Structure formats: structure tokens, C-alpha cells
Amino acid sequence: MRLHSLILLSFLLLATQAFSEKVRKRAKNAPHSTAEEGVEGSAPSLGKAQNKQRSRTSKSLTHGKFVTKDQATCRWAVTEEEQGISLKVQCTQADQEFSCVFAGDPTDCLKHDKDQIYWKQVARTLRKQKNICRNAKSVLKTRVCRKRFPESNLKLVNPNARGNTKPRKEKAEVSAREHNKVQEAVSTEPNRVKEDITLNPAATQTMAIRDPECLEDPDVLNQRKTALEFCGESWSSICTFFLNMLQATSC
């Protein structure tokens, strides 16, 4: 009876020890599994965050301002098309406004996480341009894409002699106004002189000194000198006439 009790007790001890080992192993494995589950669950969220950040960066890099080597102040912005993109440039230079469009397809290049480098190199190429929008052979090339992806080069698609050129409205209106005023002044001045001469026939008689003795008359000489000083050669005869009317002389 005593032997039977000892055997039963030993079996109970072995079972207890085995159970405790299982519990200990589960406790060790539990943190690893929860950590792995946490990593697996957070992986999609991290991917979404990276994609959002990348899209924001791309949008901020696809527009901007620049000044070319020949001092044209410009803005540029990118628009997505069905196939590729279009890059519109709007510039102001020497009181003229003009614009043009470059087009290409950098989609395959941008798939390799090169969008930041690509757009920075595009902006640098724009700043190096001369006669922008005027050269039909203009191509915006980038080092990062041009060898493996030649379709990523942006070519000028609407070249003109000066792009879509428009004069600035304010300055054009002012210059036209000034031109009209000058033309009116030039056209009316000769008519005024003719009217003065035709309305006053005595002027021609007075200006043509009939008596040679009048040439030596001090009053006449003084009038001619005063007219030359204040009116100049072109208007001296008319001024002499008015002085002769105001100052009665023997001639």
C-alpha cells in the first residue's frame, strides 16, 4: 500500500513538472508572436504613409518659378495627360508676355523612385534656357532618365517666332496715347502758322521791309534782335511782326 502511494506521488510530480514546462514555453513565445503580429499590421500603414509623403513631394516639385539666362521671368506647372505629361511655361520679358508647352512621358522613369531628382533636374534645365519658347529644337533633358528612358525628355510642342506673344496692356495703351498726342501737335502747328499769316496779310508786308533805310533803323534792329533771342530763327519773323504791332515804328 505504501509502495503504491509512492508510485502515484511520483507520477503526479512528473505531470506537474511537464505542465509547468509547457506554461513556461508558452510565456516565452507569446511576446514574439504579438510583436510579429504588430509588425505585420503596421507594415501596410507604413507603406500608405510613405506613398502619401511621396505624392506630396511630387506635387510640390511639379511647379515653380525661374529666371532664364536672358532675364525672362517665368512660371511653370505640370499637367498629367492620358499619355505622359505636359509642362506649360508662362514668361514675361521686355514688356512682352508669352507661353509655350513641353511634352513627354517620364512615367517609367518615375516608377523607380527618381521623381525628386527628375523634377529638380527639369527645373535646373529650365533656368539654363535661352530664347525660351522660340527654338523649335528645345528639349528639356535630365541625367537621371535620358539614357534608359529617352521618352522622358520633354520636347517643345508649340514653337512660334516669339511663343504666344502679347504686349502688356497698360504700357501699350499709354504709348498709343502719347503717339496720338505727338501726331496731333505736329499736324496742327503748321496749320496755325498758316492761319496766322493768312488772317494777317499785314504781317507779310511788315516782315518784308520795303524801305532800305529801315534796315538801319534802331527800333527795327532792336525788334529783330529781341525776336531772335526769345523766338529763335524759325519764329523770329512772326515775333517781329507782333513787336512791330505793339511798338509803333516809322517803318
From Swiss-Prot:
**Gene Ontology CC terms, in alphabetical order:** cell surface; extracellular region; plasma membrane
Residues with an annotated glycan are S175
Q: Which domain of life is it from?
A: Eukaryota
Any single GO BP term: fibroblast growth factor receptor signaling pathway
UniProt keyword annotations, A-Z: Cell membrane, Disulfide bond, Glycoprotein, Growth factor binding, Membrane, Secreted, Signal
Compartment(s) where it occurs, according to its Swiss-Prot or TrEMBL record: Secreted, Extracellular space; Cell membrane
Q: How does it assemble?
A: Found in a complex with FGFBP1, FGF1 and FGF2. Interacts with FGF1, FGF7, FGF10, FGF22 and HSPG2. Interacts with FGF2.
Q: What is this protein called?
A: Fibroblast growth factor-binding protein 1
Organism, as annotated: Mus musculus (Mouse)
Q: Which gene encodes it?
A: Fgfbp1
